[in-house]
Amino acid sequence: DMKGFSNEMSKHIKNITLSSQRADLSAYELIDIVEKYNGVLIPAHAFTPHKSFYGNCTSRLERIFKEKYSRIPAIELGLSSDTFLADEISELENKTFLTNSDAHSLPKIAREYNKILVENISFKELLKAIKKEDGRKILCNYGLDPKLGKYHRTYCEVCGKNIPGDAPVTKCDTCDSRNITMGVFDRIEIIKDKSKTMSPKDRPPYVYQVPLTFIPGLGKKTIDKLLDHFETEMNILHRLSFDDIDAVCGEKIATMIMQSREGKMEIQAGGGGVYGKVIEKK
C-alpha cells in the first residue's frame, strides 16, 4: 500500500524523496488517494502558520473537505496549541486530538506523545484508538505548554520581536507593520466560535511537560547523567520524587523539574519560529 501510494503521489509531487512535500492537488482530492491505499488523513500541526489548515488556509476544515469531513478522525495539535485552545472550535468536538512529536533528532522524539489504550501494538489497533472503537482510545495527551512552541504569539518580521497585547494581535504595536507571522494563540482567537473552552466528556486530559532541554541551567552532561540513572525523560518529568532527582543533580535542578511538573514555571512565549523559554525565578 505504501509503494502504491508513493507511486500515485509522485504524479503530483516534483521530488518524492523530500521530507516535506508540496502536492499539486486539493485536500478534497488527497483524502480519496489516501483512503484508496488504506490510509487515514489526519491534519498535522493543524494551527501553525505558513502551511497548516487552520493557520494559513481556512477557519473551518469542513469548508475544504465538505461531505468528506466526517472521514477525518483526528487532528494533530502541534507544539503551539493544546486541547484547551482547540476545543474553542465547535467542529472539532467529535475529533480525536493527537500530540505527536517530530523526529528530526533523537532528543526531540516524544517531547509530545499520546498514552493509548490498545490490545496490542499494531496499526489496526492504533486506528481503533484514534476512532474510539471497541473500547480503544487515547487515554492522555502529553505536550509542551503551548507558550514554548515556535509560533504561539504573533511576531513582527520588521522589528524581529513578538508583539505584546491581548489576542488577536494583527499588526505591530511598534512600527505599525502588518508584515507579521500570526501566532497560533492569536489565530485561534480569530477563528474560534465558542466564548470559552468546552471539551466533550470523552476528551482525555492534556498534561503539560517541559522537556529537560528547556530547563535553565540543565546542560547536556547533567541530562545524560539523569538519563543514565533514570532511563527515560518521562520518568524524570512525571514520576520521580524530588529526593530521587536531588540525589543525582542537586536541589536547584530538582526544584525546577518539580515546578515544571506543577505548572509553576514562568514562560516567555515563542513566536516567529523561535521557541519560547523558561524564565528562571530569582
Predicted regions and their residues:
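Extended substrate/RNA-proximal surfaces in nucleic-acid metabolism proteins
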Residues: 1-73
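Short acidic/histidine-rich active-site segments
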Residues: 95-111
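A metal-dependent hydrolase metal-coordination microenvironment
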Residues: 1-29, 78-92, 97, 113, ...
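Divalent metal-coordination and catalytic microenvironments
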Residues: 41, 75, 102, 175-176, ...
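Histidine/acidic-residue-rich catalytic or RNA/ligand-binding cores of hydrolases
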Residues: 51-59, 107-120
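Short, amphipathic C-terminal "tail helix"
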Residues: 255-282
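Cys/His-rich short segments
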Residues: 134-206
